[in-house]
Amino acid sequence: MQTILTDQASFNILTSKRNLINKLTITNIVLWALFVFCAIATAFLAISHSFHKNFSFFLESGNSNNEGETTTKVNIHVLVAQILTPIFTVLLILCWMGNIGINSLLFGQLSICQQFQNEKKWLLWAIFIPQLTLTNSLLVREKLKNILDANSNSSTQKNRLTWWMIGFFVVWFIQLFLGFLIYLPAYSAEARLNLNLSFLSFALNSPLPVGHAANGYFFLGLIFAFMDLTIIVLLVISGFILKHLIQTNKTEHKKYQLMFFWTALAIDVIGLIMTISFIVVSFSLEKGDDYLLKTPFFGSSLMALITIATLVTTILLFIRFNKKRLLKD
């Protein structure tokens, strides 16, 4: 209790500052939502641009009664994709910078507090790693709330951690299922492109034949976009989980730490496999016009690399607060 009063006096924390903390956290979450939306929009625009380019090449050699009108629509779609893609990319960067700013502001307010000295060195990592930006902001907000209100409910925290872990595993299994859809066909690039699907023929009511390369490209691009989404969702969920695991050193949370640690290792391996396979698929395309369709594959490989970086940091954090527990024991 004396420690809480000391921290309260050193910071001169007023009750009104709770609203400021909440507003900063809400802003951080909103920026994260915009970050996720811009990332998904950029991926889908890249897929749309690639597909319509390929579709226009197909129309040039096809026999369609409305070829001129359809080609005009395709060109409009390509133009819209070319205009919106840099806009969403700039918004994505601005959201990322906003998250860094909020993270820095919260840590700047707490720089004189002894309770937060150990977390300051992770601020630099948060500039490069998306996972830690959200984690640090949530951690700081929780510690400030505990300073203002000593009546924290440990059982509520435990229940929240349980639900976050369940959500983490659910999203992870969705990612595994999407990966299974990609690697179910043969391992050659040609087999991946000719998936014998008539999805586009049904959706566009177009004369595309079943098994046409555009079907395979669009379907694979759609799966890759959803895999990018699951990666981002995993980063957000793991941020909340890390906040709980770093904040508490209770023995009852050891099982959650082990589960999260081994799952992180598994996703690390999956991310490495995804990176290698996406790059191989991307650069194994032989046709000249296929180079227009490499953006989704390359973007997914970058997301896989980001995943590996964040999970390596997760492992370092895991080792860090387990070393503290061993020293205390």
Swiss-Prot record:
Keywords, in A-Z order: Cell membrane, Membrane, Transmembrane, Transmembrane helix
Presence of the UniProt keyword Lipid metabolism in the record: no
Which coarse location class describes where this protein primarily resides? Answer: membrane
Q: How does it sit in the membrane?
A: Multi-pass membrane protein
Q: From the Swiss-Prot or TrEMBL record, give the protein name.
A: Uncharacterized protein MPN_090
Has UniProt tagged this entry with the keyword Manganese? Answer: no
Q: How is this protein annotated for GO cellular component?
A: plasma membrane
Bilayer-crossing residues are 29-49, 78-98, 120-140, 164-184, 217-237, 260-280, 299-319
Record's family? To M.pneumoniae MPN_129.
